Amino acid sequence: MRHALKLLLLSLVLAATVDGLAWAGFDEALKAYQAKDFSTALSEARRAAGAGDPRSSLLLGAMYQAGQGVEADQTQAVSHYETAAKGGVIGAFSKLAQAYSRGAGVARDREKALAYARRAAQLGDLEGTFFLSVILTAEYLGYLDPGGKPDDKKYWQLAGRPLSERGIDTEARDALYWSADKGYPLAMMTMALNMGGSIGDGNRKRMQALIDKMPNNSYPALQNYGRISKHMDTLGDSFTSPQLFFDAQAQQMVAAMLQTCGLRDRKEMDKLPMPKLIATKITKPVSNAVYLPSKVAGYDRAYLIAGDWEEGWTYTGCDKTATVTIKFTADGLGGARIVSEQTMKGR
C-alpha cells in the first residue's frame, strides 16, 4: 500500500514538473517570438509542445504558416493547429477555419471551414467570429461572378428571399456586429464600410463612431463615406446611406436643373451652373418596414430588407430654389432604389 502511494505521489510530482516545464517553455518561446528571435522561439515552442503544452502548438502553427525561423510549410502549420485545437486552445479553431477555406495545407473544404469558424465563435474568439461572418458572406451570400463582377441574376435571387430563408444572413451579420463591438480591428473596418452602404436606423452614426475609433484609417472608400456622412449631417434628415446618397446625386441633379435653370436638353448642362443641394428632409417615413432580425443588442433595425419612404431634396441654382421629391424602396439586400419619376416644386 505504501509502495503504491509512493508511486502515485511520484507520478503526480513528475506530472507537475512536466507541466511546469511546458508552461515555462511556452513563456520563453512567446517572449522570444515577440522579440523576433524566431530561432529561439522555435526551439522553445517545440520543447514545450513536446511536453504537452497545446499553446506552443498554436505558436508553432503560426511560425510554420508564416515561415518564421523555419521554411514555410502549410501542411505542418495545419498539423500543429489541429494539435492545439485538440488541446482546447481557442485561437486554433479560427486558424483551421481559414486553412480549410483557402485550401492551405489541406484540401479546400467549405463545410469544415464553416464548422471550425462556428466553433471559434461559440468559444468567443474575436478573429474566429469575424471570419465566420466573412465565410458566410463570401461563400453563401456572395453574388459575384468568377471574374469578380456583380452577377445581377444572383443578386436579385438573394434579394428576393423571404425572411424565413435568411437565417444565414442573421448569423453572418451578428458575427460581424459582435466582433466589431468587441473591438476586433478588421471587423470594425468591415462594419464601418458595411454601415456606409446599407440602410438602417442609426447606421451613419454607427459608421462615424467606428471611424472615430480608427484615427489611422487610410482606406479611401471609408474616408469618402466619412466625408459624405458629415456633409449629409449639414443638410438635414435623410434615411439614405452615404453610398445611396452619392449614387442618387446625378439623377437628382438633372431633375433640379430642369426646375431651377429651365434645362430643356441634356446638351445644355455644360453651359448651365450646377444646382447646389442645400437641404434634405424625410417627407414620408419608412412604411411596411421589414428588418433583418438580430440577436445582438441594438441591431434589430440595422438592416432594412423591405420598405418604402420619401424624401424632399432642395436645390438652389440660377437664382431659384426647387425641391425634388424622391421615392425610395428597399432592394432586399440592405440597399434601396428610386422607384418613381421625381416631381419638382419650384419657388
Name the predicted role of every residue range.
Residues 25-51:
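Alpha-helical segment of the N-proximal tetratricopeptide repeat
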Residues 50-53, 66-68, 87-89, 102-104, ...:
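Short helix-capping/linker turns of helical repeat alpha-solenoids
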Residues 164, 218-347:
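Cysteine-centric segments in proteins
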Residues 174-181, 203-220:
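TPR/TPR-like (Sel1-like) alpha-helical repeat modules
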